[in-house]
Amino acid sequence: MQEAYKAIADPTRRRILKYLRGGERTAGELAEYAKVGRTALSHHLMVLKLANLVRVERRGQFQVYSLNTTVFQDLLTEITDWLGGKNESSETSIIEDEAITHSDQVSDAL
């Protein structure tokens, strides 16, 4: 999952992913939309493929890219869990975190 976080940290890759939300795209379409050269696009697509965020399928002379929505669902679940879970309000999580921090500070002072 770490590769996915690194991949989406880059604004060009996020732009590519956003464009792929509209459906399958060829490498040429992606390069034009992202306003990057073929070499830079190749690098970005490799990072996205290694993170398993996009799928690629060869169709004749073209490579067609699409989103791997399963990985995005896993990322969303992981982030939701990290932020405090689906059934827990964020306000409650923040209060609990502050209570733990305060408790640790009191223990350190003793």
Across the structure, where does each feature detected by a protein language model lie?
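Extended rod-forming repeat segments used as scaffolds/tethers
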Residues: L17, L50-A51, D104
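N-terminal helix-turn-helix DNA-binding core of bacterial DNA-binding proteins
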Residues: Q2-A40, Q61-F72
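Amphipathic alpha-helical dimerization/coiled-coil segments
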Residues: T69, Q73-L110
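Short stretches within intrinsically disordered, low-complexity N-terminal or propeptide regions
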Residues: S42, L53, T101-S103
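Short, hydrophobic-biased segments on the C-terminal half of alpha helices
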Residues: L45-M46
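Beta-hairpin "wing" of winged helix-turn-helix
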Residues: K49-R59, S66
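Single-residue recognition of alpha-helix boundary sites
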Residues: E24, R55, I79-T80
